[in-house]
């Protein structure tokens, strides 16, 4: 699966469709290579209005991301897919709304130096010092971290893949 090519194909479609399709394609690829295993795929997209914030390409891009999110409400969108025997058996979409505090350039630079969140869409790690960047979080924190665990565990239990 070429993720960049797929993102271009999905451009303009609803975020829920984009993120669940990306999760599905990731899981399907591995599932076809491991047909007797349950495979979980996941994808996240950070959005502010109609703009998607991918992982930053460099430090300057990271600063620009955080400056755009500073003082604003944005969404972390998560898609999950479970595949078995090369077929998708379940998918889920979840969204968490976050409001970032107003940040100065120095606060942004200090945060980037501290957490180095360059591999995260939105350019922050909620599970670490990034938590301090927000005035409110409405939804599942696990969605922000890349995998809506509550929904996944519930489905794995329902499918008797795990037992709670």
Describe the role of every protein-language-model region.
Residues 63-67, 78-80, 87-91, 95:
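Anionic-ligand binding region
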Residues 1-38, 51, 103-106, 150-153, ...:
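N-terminal polybasic phosphate/anion-binding patch
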Residues 23, 43, 62, 80, ...:
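Residue-level signal for inorganic ion chemistry
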Residues 37-38, 74, 79-81, 132:
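Structural motif
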Residues 11, 18, 44-74, 100:
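Active-site-adjacent loop/tail segments of enzyme domains
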């Amino acid at each position: 699966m070429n993720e960049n090519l797929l993102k271009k194909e999905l451009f303009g479609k609803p975020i829920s469709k984009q993120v669940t399709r990306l999760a599905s394609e990731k899981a399907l690829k591995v599932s076809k290579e491991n047909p007797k295993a349950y495979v979980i795929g996941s994808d996240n997209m950070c959005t502010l209005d109609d703009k998607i914030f991918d992982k930053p390409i460099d430090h300057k891009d990271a600063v620009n991301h955080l400056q755009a999110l500073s003082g604003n409400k944005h969404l972390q969108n998560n898609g999950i897919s479970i595949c078995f025997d090369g077929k998708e058996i379940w998918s889920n979409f979840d969204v968490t709304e976050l409001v970032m505090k107003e940040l100065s350039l120095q606060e942004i630079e200090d945060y980037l130096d501290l957490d180095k969140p360059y591999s995260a869409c939105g350019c922050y790690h909620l599970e670490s010092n990034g938590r301090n960047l927000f005035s409110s979080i409405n939804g599942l924190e696990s969605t922000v971290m890349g995998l809506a665990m509550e929904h996944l565990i519930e489905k794995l239990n329902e499918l008797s893949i795990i037992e709670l």
